[in-house]
Swiss-Prot record:
Source taxon at top rank: Eukaryota
Localization per record: Cytoplasm; Nucleus
BP-aspect Gene Ontology terms: N-terminal peptidyl-aspartic acid acetylation; N-terminal peptidyl-glutamic acid acetylation; N-terminal peptidyl-glutamine acetylation; N-terminal protein amino acid acetylation; regulation of actin cytoskeleton organization
Known role: Catalytic subunit of the NatB complex which catalyzes acetylation of the N-terminal methionine residues of peptides beginning with Met-Asp, Met-Glu, Met-Asn and Met-Gln. Proteins with cell cycle functions are overrepresented in the pool of NatB substrates. Required for maintaining the structure and function of actomyosin fibers and for proper cellular migration.
Pfam families from the UniProt entry: Acetyltransf_1 (PF00583)
N-acetyltransferase domain segment(s): 2-157
Originating organism: Xenopus laevis (African clawed frog)
EC number(s) stated in the UniProt entry for this protein: 2.3.1.254
Name this protein carries in UniProt: N-alpha-acetyltransferase 20
Length: 178
């Protein structure tokens, strides 16, 4: 049976199998520790019965309550290749959405590479829609061009009029994101 639990510092030394995917954004240890310190409830890991890490989600709460922009943000979601197509990503997303609901969020958002159609389609199946395109959000390496991202959102119950998911009519640049 899969166990969903809080991510711990020790997990940082055990999750390389999950982060080997080229579409997974990886960060330095201080970045992960910052999330653990500030938003521990938004950092969840899935563990197999034998103790192997299967996947994780890392997020945070951000935005302005006054402007009805307080929300949960998915910083990273990744499942190890051998554990994909089991509904694990959907379950991790559901947990982050529940936490965001309890924290009074208006919506949950995330950024995904435009080219990652498998992920885009999964998020759409989970009720997310494209709010805007962010031009050259992902920095490329090896002389490749930078890549655009979709900012995808799902309204939560607090956003009764679904204002947070009305798509923007034009793309934005990373520096225009609040």
């Amino acid at each position: 049976m899969t166990t969903l639990r809080a991510f711990t510092c020790d997990d940082l030394f055990r999750f390389n199998n999950i982060n080997l995917d080229p579409l997974t954004e990886t960060y330095g240890i201080p970045f992960y520790l910052q999330y653990l310190a500030h938003w521990p409830e938004y950092f969840i890991v899935a563990e197999a019965p034998g103790g192997e890490l299967m996947g994780y989600i890392m997020g945070k709460a951000e935005g302005s309550v006054a402007r009805e922009e307080w929300h949960g943000h998915v910083t990273a979601l990744s499942v190890a290749p051998e554990f994909r197509r089991l509904g694990l990503a959907a379950k991790l997303m559901e947990l982050l959405e529940e936490i965001s609901e309890r924290k009074g969020g208006f919506f949950v958002d995330l950024f995904v590479r435009v080219s990652n159609q498998v992920a885009v389609n999964m998020y759409k199946q989970l009720g997310y829609s494209v709010y805007r395109t962010v031009i050259e959000y992902y920095s490329a390496s090896n002389g490749e061009p930078d890549e655009d991202a979709y900012d995808m959102r799902k309204a939560l119950s607090r956003d009764t009029e679904k204002k947070s998911i009305v798509p923007l009519p034009h793309p934005v640049r990373p520096e225009d994101i609040e």
